[in-house]
Amino acid sequence: MRILQRLLLSALLPIILVVAGCAATRPAPDAATLAALVPTGTLRVGVYPGSPTSMVLVGKTGEKAGLAHDLGFALGAALGVPVKLVEFSRVAQVIDALKAGQVDFTFTNASESRARDVDFAPTLVRLELGYLVMQGSPIGAISDVDKPGMRVGVSQGSTSQGVLGRQFKNATLVPAPSLDLAQEMLRQQKMDAFATNKGILFELSDAMPNSRVLQGRWGYEALAIAIPKGRQTGLPYLLRFGQDMAASGQLQSLVQRAGLRGTAGSE
């Protein structure tokens, strides 16, 4: 375990050094800010595997990366507190854990529905939404998706499930409990396409021969830091933290480290 911790800290050292430099120009967090952001004294970061926006394995050693993962460690370094990763199967479970106060931080789509359950800092990254299909799928273009008989997979409890459920007039949604199961359902032709952000879609496609991400998009995700409701005292600090990460170029470095594709520009 200690070896793994040393490897992780080594991989994140450039991030921590940049954060330390940024912190020199940012006021130190006061007691109220720390109480809001890390009430237990440890920053509990909620992640789920398979999405570069959350957590993926990168490099020959398979070290952990991803925006929620790396931003969480960067924030912990800025605050001067330890970080604990809390892993879930899918994003909906991360949001539920935030609502319950079981985790303190994640990075995810700041949708209108989620904003009713958690608080968001300003948007840091915009990401295109699209579809993944297998060779031989009856869906060859986005215009083919919402037709009778088409089965479109989504992550169970995701924003995509809610948005497409309202938009579709003909296609049927097929919820998948995890990204691994979504891959299997695509391979077994239990769905004709899978819908989510392109960061996830390209990751899935890399692991699935004879699959491709359709050209075009059906929308955008606005990705932002999320914290539990009732901790708004910490939001001004998160605003400055995000601004510093973007201005220093470190946010873009994290995007590249995670291998995140499909971005539509940062704000």
What is the meaning of each model-derived region?
Residues P49-G50, V125-G136, K198, F202-Q243, ...:
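Periplasmic-binding protein-like
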Residues A23-A28, G66-A78, S137, S143-R151, ...:
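Extended ligand-binding regions for polar small-molecule ligands
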Residues M1-L12:
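Bacterial N-terminal signal peptides that target proteins for export
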Residues R26-N109, R257:
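Extracytoplasmic small-molecule ligand-binding "clamshell" domains
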Residues V18-G21:
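C-terminal motif of bacterial Sec signal peptides marking the signal peptidase cleavage site
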Residues V81-P82, K99-T108, M150-R151, R187-I200, ...:
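Alpha-to-beta junction loops
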Residues H69, F73, A77, P82-D146, ...:
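Acidic, polar ligand-binding/catalytic clefts
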Residues V47-P52, T61-A78, L132-E184, K198-I200, ...:
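Bilobed "Venus flytrap"/periplasmic-binding protein-like clamshell domains
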